[in-house]
Swiss-Prot record:
The keyword Phosphoprotein applies. It is found in: Nucleus; Cytoplasm, Cytoskeleton, Spindle; Chromosome, Centromere, Kinetochore. It holds the Pfam family DASH_Dam1. Its main location: nucleus. It comes from Saccharomyces cerevisiae (strain ATCC 204508 / S288c) (Baker's yeast). PANTHER family: DASH COMPLEX SUBUNIT DAM1. Keywords: Acetylation, Cell cycle, Cell division, Centromere, Chromosome, Chromosome partition, Coiled coil, Cytoplasm, Cytoskeleton, Kinetochore, Microtubule, Mitosis, Nucleus, Phosphoprotein. Residues 316-336 have a biased composition (Basic and acidic residues). GO terms for biological process: attachment of spindle microtubules to kinetochore; cell division; centromere clustering; mitotic sister chromatid biorientation; positive regulation of attachment of spindle microtubules to kinetochore; positive regulation of microtubule polymerization; protein localization to chromosome, centromeric region; protein transport along microtubule to mitotic spindle pole body. Component of the DASH complex that connects microtubules with kinetochores and couples microtubule depolymerisation to chromosome movement; it is involved in retrieving kinetochores to the spindle poles before their re-orientation on the spindle in early mitosis and allows microtubule depolymerization to pull chromosomes apart and resist detachment during anaphase. This is DASH complex subunit DAM1. The gene is DAM1. The modification Phosphoserine is found at residues 20, 31, 257, 265, 292. Component of the DASH complex consisting of ASK1, DAD1, DAD2, DAD3, DAD4, DAM1, DUO1, HSK3, SPC19 and SPC34, with a stoichiometry of one copy of each subunit per complex. Multiple DASH complexes oligomerize to form a ring that encircles spindle microtubules and organizes the rod-like NDC80 complexes of the outer kinetochore. DASH complex oligomerization strengthens microtubule attachments. Within the complex, DAM1 and DUO1 may form the microtubule connections. On cytoplasmic microtubules, DASH complexes appear to form patches instead of rings.
Amino acid sequence: MSEDKAKLGTTRSATEYRLSIGSAPTSRRSSMGESSSLMKFADQEGLTSSVGEYNENTIQQLLLPKIRELSDSIITLDSNFTRLNFIHESLADLNESLGSLLYGIMSNSWCVEFSQAPHDIQDDLIAIKQLKSLEDEKNNLVMELSNMERGIKRKKDEQGENDLAKASQNKQFNQPLFPSSQVRKYRSYDNRDKRKPSKIGNNLQVENEEDYEDDTSSEASFVLNPTNIGMSKSSQGHVTKTTRLNNNTNSKLRRKSILHTIRNSIASGADLPIENDNVVNLGDLHPNNRISLGSGAARVVNGPVTKNRNSMFSGRAERKPTESRHSVAKKTEKKINTRPPFR
């Protein structure tokens, strides 16, 4: 600002002016009092001049002061505009200085608040771009690896399927084996029990656990002689060891109800030997092998009693020569008078 003032002092216009009252009369603005004094002086001189001189003096006395006043006003306006320009430049400088001050204060507060923030922004932007490029490259590599692994897995699966197909073609068909508990073996009606009777005689021997389990899980296990549990059961002499194992596995099914056991016994009556249209009891064929009194329930029918049943505490029990429970007894007609009265 001082430089501008120095320039203004050195490069002043030709017409110098001052707004103060004590300025030089040459630069003083004209006024109406001055014009009136001049008019009086002109009137005094005009008395001695002619008409032409009066007109010329009038133009000089009236127009020239006004023109001078106009020129002084224009010069004053020019100076005022110049000073206004200086004021505007000073305000612009002040604005720049104030903006710089505010920017410095904000930068200082930013550095104080965020001390960990980076200051080199250009390097940070370059590093961010490099990180993005590396991440994209990593994703591409991961995709390629996954595609390669899928291809290898597919090849292995196809190779395994081909090997299985070849093995299935070369392998012969094996008939499925069913367990003995799921297969029922049927015997013909005319089949006779051709096995030799196994007699124990007077020597009492203890059987193994399988025989004991067979005694407790037979068709008539709901009636059991507690005194003869340990002895062998010979009334079912046609039952082999394999059928005993089957009976053990199917014991739960046969224990559902007494009716099921009776139906099974009736259905298996074809295995008994038949002589002269009469069912022969296996207990009669092998009387010495009879152990349990509860191994089978027999129906009481009218007929002669050939043998007596031994006591419960005897070493062995013999079966009466009655018809087997596996067969249906022949009904004999009775007279009405022999029936018992209704109760």
